Swiss-Prot record:
This is UDP-N-acetylglucosamine 1-carboxyvinyltransferase. It catalyses: phosphoenolpyruvate + UDP-N-acetyl-alpha-D-glucosamine = UDP-N-acetyl-3-O-(1-carboxyvinyl)-alpha-D-glucosamine + phosphate. InterPro entries: Enolpyruvate_Tfrase_dom, Enolpyruvate_Tfrase_sf, MurA_subfamily, RNA3'P_cycl/enolpyr_Trfase_a/b, UDP_GlcNAc_COvinyl_MurA. Cell wall formation. Adds enolpyruvyl to UDP-N-acetylglucosamine. SUPFAM superfamilies: EPT/RTPC-like. The gene is murA.
Length: 419
């Protein structure tokens, strides 16, 4: 099994180009089921993207891959879907597989989707997905680990209030409603930029969606959608990770291809710690200043601080001056990186959904193990901050969400080897 060997102590300096957003491209790929052909550009080279390609092919879609040095183009032809079952062997690899449920049901009136897998960071149940589809008239049962959904005729437009904000359920609801009969009003929706990107793509395909980027989305269902081309937005989680990498290594990085407004909440939190963050043309520059202050953090739905950056921020706080409290409000069991950081000398105490981080003078290299995608990159950041060697095991998580991470960091002065 592969591992990373990280020799830290080197300030990162240089330029990093941000890849397309994983959390946008996956639902957009699922949206291809709603039309005959969809051309997607700025697609990142990730194992999760490969898994979604495998899933779409299993349904009968044809996929043309146009490979460039730093991205893919995908041309997905879903005119001949012939299998409405999303099999466990594929779905277990990635929770985003659940997003084929809404499109299959809406276009074909039937779907059978295995209960999903992915990172082990909490229950993340599908109850809200099922509830909103039932509100549209679907008949749904769960048997033998599969969601069985069907509808007599088209799904019906509905008014639905999400009991809690859910990115995944908002996505499935939108994907189902665009071909439903009548108007759908969704309340208490997630507002993430990746949902905005999905809605913009669907509108380019001929959907009628308004309220995009707000908590109230209005969808007038269409009889069909048309072919379209769409470029995926840049990955704010990747950008935030490299912003923290500049800070934790006392470096100076310029990140290009990212819109500052979608990372502004990250920038403001870094500025609060004493790091210098400046918008530049088509990107952002992050520069270490004189010190790193400890600050508190709470994860919340967008526009709050992203849970997908919590672990990386915690790594930064382990070497800050003072004590910080990090509160995880989105997922339970998302502090699995804490014991590994403590192996490197961090001083962290977990109490429920809070982690109290007492900054130390510096971390020490150690052998550590990644439990999930975001934990893996947080341990890389920690390793980069040390003046010794860190060995990271179970790095298969990393390739699910970060394209060419070692190459991008090594080009800026890091010393990371995959063996």
């Amino acid at each position: 099994m592969q591992k990373l060997i990280i020799h830290g102590g080197k300030p990162l300096k240089g330029i990093i180009n941000i890849s397309g957003a994983k959390n946008a491209v996956l639902p957009i790929m699922a949206a291809s089921i709603l039309t005959d052909k969809l051309h997607i550009t700025n697609v990142p080279k990730l194992t999760d993207v490969s898994t979604m390609k495998e899933l779409l092919k299993s349904h009968g879609a044809g996929i043309e891959i146009i490979e460039h040095e730093n991205e893919f183009e995908l041309v997905i032809n879903a005119a001949n879907i012939n299998n409405l079952t999303a099999d466990y062997e594929i779905v277990r690899k990635m929770r985003a597989s659940i997003w084929v449920l809404g499109p299959l049901l809406s276009r074909y009136g039937k779907a059978k989707v295995s209960l999903p897998g992915g990172c082990a960071i909490g229950a993340r149940q599908v109850d809200l997905h099922i509830a909103v589809l039932k509100a549209m008239g679907a008949e749904i049962t769960i048997e033998d680990g599969y969601i069985n959904a069907s509808t007599a005729g088209r799904l019906k437009g509905t008014h639905f209030i999400f009991d809690k904000i859910s990115v995944g359920a908002t996505i499935n609801a939108v994907l189902a409603a665009v071909l439903a009969d009548g108007e759908t009003l969704l309340f208490n929706c997630a507002r993430e930029p990746e949902i905005v990107d999905l809605c913009n793509c669907l509108n380019k395909m001929g959907a009628d969606i308004s309220g995009i980027g707000t908590s109230e989305i209005r969808i007038n269902g269409k009889d069909s959608l048309s072919e379209a081309s769409y470029r995926v937005l840049p990955d704010r989680i990747e950008a935030g990770t490299y912003m923290f990498a500049a800070a934790i290594t006392k470096g100076d990085l310029k990140l290009y291809g990212i819109d500052y407004h979608i990372i502004e909440n990250i920038a403001l939190k870094l500025i609060e710690t004493g790091i210098k963050v400046m918008p530049i043309d088509n990107g952002v520059q992050v520069t270490y200043a004189d010190k790193l202050n400890a600050v508190n953090l709470e994860t919340n739905p967008y526009p709050g601080f992203a849970t997908d950056l919590q672990a990386q921020f915690m790594s930064l706080m382990t070497i800050s001056q003072g004590s910080s409290i990090i509160t995880e409000n989105i997922f339970e069991n998302r502090f699995m990186h804490v014991p590994e950081l403590c192996r490197m000398g961090a001083d962290i105490t977990v109490r429920g959904n809070q982690a109290i981080v007492q900054g130390v003078k510096g971390l020490k290299g150690a052998e550590v193990m990644a439990s999930d995608l975001r934990a893996s990159v947080s341990l890389i950041l920690a390793g980069l901050s040390t003046d010794s060697e860190t060995v990271l095991h179970r790095i298969y998580h990393l390739d699910r969400g970060f394209q060419n991470l070692e190459k991008k960091l090594n080009n800026c002065g890091a010393d990371i080897k995959r063996v």
